[in-house]
Amino acid sequence: MYIRISKTDKIIGWAASIGIGLTILVADFLYLWGSPLFDDYIIFALIEICLIPAVLYFLEHRWISGCDDNIPLLLRDLTEAQRAGLPLVRAIEEAAKREYGPLTGELKKTANQITWGIPFAEAILNFGERVGTVLAKRAARLMVEASRAGARVHDIFEVITNSVQEMRNLELERKAEMMPYTFIVYVAFFVFLFITIILTNIFFTPAATYAFMSLTMVEESKVILFRMGMAEAFLSGLVAGKMGEGAVSGGLKHSVIMLTIGYIVFIKFVGVF
């Protein structure tokens, strides 16, 4: 199931996240200042601020990917229908009866508009605008130009289909090439966590036992490492999103994941707080 996220949804999501997060932060500073739980609630607030926008971005990205994956399939079916002798308008009406993921609803609207007498070019351009992806808009413009070509429209549509498929393949290849960089960001974060566990359990704790370090110094060191780890988790997540998906907002989910993992590791294996 695909869910389309509007600009209004994103504004409401950000407003709700920031509002709840700021409420947690204000309460934290007012009631937990100096408490062992002070840092915990800062992390909870940060996760809350990132969580809803991360979910909205994921749903939006899923919608866009679903549309762009199905556009070449739609064009290919339109090409085959025209080869079989169907006029372009009739081919679109038949395609509207099939399943093309998130494109299905918009395609049905386009078929209805054509049936109601709206010019073909206008209906197709409206389709591209409603879907809203760069690939959909390009495909819509190419379809309009092809419809004006006259004879052998199906040959032109075949060229368009191949062109659009190539554009989609290039985009997927770019994302695949950037995935290793996202992986490197995660590896760097996990290396930091591993080193922290080694330091605290093999060096700091024995040092306190044999009086080389005071217990206060050990606890302060753990808190410093915790804060460094949480800062790295948040910022590394944003970097992973920028490198892997080309958008900082795409890194919010990585930030949430790293913050959650980092918090659990520090509580369970480092013994902070």
Language model features by range: what are they?
Residues 1-84, 97-102, 165-273:
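Hydrophobic alpha-helical signal-anchor/transmembrane segments
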Residues 74-77, 81-154, 158-162, 168:
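Glycine- and small-hydrophobic-enriched helix-loop-helix hairpins
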